[in-house]
């Protein structure tokens, strides 16, 4: 009798939309359904199947470790050969002392003549440098005077005159040549022998 009364009270208190067997599901999924626009996924959809553990043979594992230790010892004993830099190595034929040019001893008159010639050459180059410097200074002064006169005549022409000339850079120059070029010269396409040395380093395989 008491049990029937309790069941009737429970049926009266529960909501009409309540379906048997869904109460537990609502309680369990409330933390997942925060938004109605969100994707309603369940916990099993975010999970992945358990991976099967591989059985490792202790003997194979120990054999692999031994092979690795043996390879390391082999590398420590025989270090790799460094590739030589041929540009920094002087050929043996150039180290022969018999090919050295003996030092010439000049007479006092010849030494004096060379010293005077060097002084005259230094004086000539100094005068040439001063002449070039004076010519550049006079050209700059004339250019500045012409710009000032142009500025008084027309501001637009002055603005165009002081603009940077983009055709000056990059600067390309050819010559002077030691010999005059030969017109209609075709360079011969001959054969050549490649004597570049190729070095191979031994790699130890696992």
Curated annotation (Swiss-Prot):
Q: Name one GO biological process term.
A: mitochondrial translation
Q: In which tissues is it expressed?
A: Ubiquitous.
Q: Transit peptide extent? A: 1-46
Q: Where does it localize? A: Mitochondrion
User: Is Transmembrane set as a keyword in this record?
Assistant: no
Under Pfam families, the record lists: MRP-L28 (PF09812)
Spell out the residue ranges making up region: Disordered.
170-189
Sorted alphabetically, the keyword list is: Mitochondrion, Ribonucleoprotein, Ribosomal protein, Transit peptide
The record, for Gene3D superfamilies, names:
6.10.250.3440
What GO CC annotations are associated with the protein?
A: mitochondrial inner membrane; mitochondrial large ribosomal subunit; mitochondrial ribosome; mitochondrion; nucleolus
> From the record, what ranges are coiled-coil?
none
Q: Is Coiled coil set as a keyword in this record? A: no
Regarding protein family, the annotation reads:
Belongs to the mitochondrion-specific ribosomal protein mL40 family.
Assembly, per entry: Component of the mitochondrial ribosome large subunit (39S) which comprises a 16S rRNA and about 50 distinct proteins.
Q: What is this protein called?
A: Large ribosomal subunit protein mL40
């Amino acid at each position: 009798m008491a049990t029937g009364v309790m069941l009737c009270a429970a049926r009266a208190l529960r909501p009409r939309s309540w379906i048997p067997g869904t109460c537990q599901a609502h309680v369990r999924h409330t933390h997942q359904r925060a938004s109605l626009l969100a994707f309603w996924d369940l916990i099993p959809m975010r999970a992945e199947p358990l991976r099967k553990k591989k059985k490792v043979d202790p003997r194979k594992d120990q054999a692999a470790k031994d092979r690795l230790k043996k390879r390391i010892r082999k590398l420590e004993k025989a270090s790799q050969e460094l590739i030589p830099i041929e540009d920094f190595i002087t050929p043996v034929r150039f180290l022969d002392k018999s090919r050295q040019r003996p030092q010439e001893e000049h007479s006092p008159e010849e030494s004096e003549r060379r010293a005077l010639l060097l002084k005259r050459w230094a004086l000539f180059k100094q005068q040439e440098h001063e002449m070039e410097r004076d010519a550049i200074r006079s050209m700059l002064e004339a250019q500045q005077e012409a710009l000032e006169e142009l500025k008084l005549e027309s501001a637009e022409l002055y603005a165009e005159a002081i603009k940077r000339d983009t055709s000056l850079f990059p600067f390309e120059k050819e010559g002077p040549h030691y010999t005059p070029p030969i017109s209609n010269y075709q360079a011969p396409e001959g054969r050549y022998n490649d004597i570049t040395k190729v070095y191979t380093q031994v790699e130890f395989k696992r």
